[in-house]
Swiss-Prot record:
InterPro entries assigned to the protein according to its UniProt record, in alphabetical order: Chitin_synth, Chitin_synth_fun
Protein name: Chitin synthase 3
UniProt record similarity statement: Belongs to the chitin synthase family. Class II subfamily.
Species: Ajellomyces capsulatus (Darling's disease fungus)
Keywords: Cell membrane, Cell wall biogenesis/degradation, Glycosyltransferase, Membrane, Transferase, Transmembrane
GO biological process assignments: cell wall organization; chitin biosynthetic process
Catalytic activity, reaction form: [(1->4)-N-acetyl-beta-D-glucosaminyl](n) + UDP-N-acetyl-alpha-D-glucosamine = [(1->4)-N-acetyl-beta-D-glucosaminyl](n+1) + UDP + H(+)
């Protein structure tokens, strides 16, 4: 759940940045209403229970509702939708409006079976992309912590040039507190 909350809290910090752009024609204080965060978990038996607990604490997930079979037919996925007003930081501390966190619209898709990453991408684009018709899609793996303005800069690349079809951000390894992560040769390299 630490990796999951690192990513979601980073996304919510970015939503706060979008909303802080009060002179923008696109964003501003209600900018959060133009953003939907889609979370896709690859397999109900594979997702860590503490990640589900984090989603439940944010109000997104309810335990005990998902069923394997409905009307004698196997279920492919379970979809939960909620607008949360709280975030869990990587230390599992609640952050809300008092800390500047803006509301966040979340769709959580809990796939019944583990069918790997590309299948999850298909779910995102074919199911949610068609329903939401977004102008820009940004895919993040769990554990990736976007900087507080990173998603804005990715969005801006698309906004400034309609010929841009893809963009990639810079990835930096987390050095840890007191740069202790540098003792790990993979991080240090």
């Amino acid at each position: 759940e630490i990796h999951f909350t690192r990513t979601t809290h980073g996304i919510m910090a970015n939503i706060t940045h979008f909303c802080s752009r009060t002179k923008s024609r696109t964003w501003g204080k209600d900018g959060w209403q133009k953003i939907v965060v889609c979370i896709i978990a690859d397999g109900r038996q594979k997702v860590h229970p503490r990640t589900l607990n984090a989603l439940a604490a944010m109000g997104v997930y309810q335990d005990g509702i998902a069923k394997n079979i409905v009307n004698q037919k196997p279920v492919n996925a379970h979809v939960y939708e909620y607008t949360t007003q709280v975030s869990l930081d990587p230390d599992l501390k609640f952050k809300g409006a008092e800390k500047g966190i803006m509301p966040c619209q979340i769709i959580f898709c809990l796939k019944e079976r583990n069918e790997k990453k590309l299948n999850s991408h298909r779910w995102f684009f074919n199911a949610f992309g068609r329903a939401l018709t977004p102008n820009v899609c940004i895919l993040l793996d769990v554990g990736t912590k976007p900087g507080p303005t990173a998603l804005y800069h990715l969005w801006k690349a698309f906004d400034q040039d309609s010929n841009v079809a893809g963009a990639a951000g810079e990835i930096k390894a987390g050095k840890g507190k007191g740069w202790l992560g540098l003792f790990n040769p993979l991080v240090a390299s």
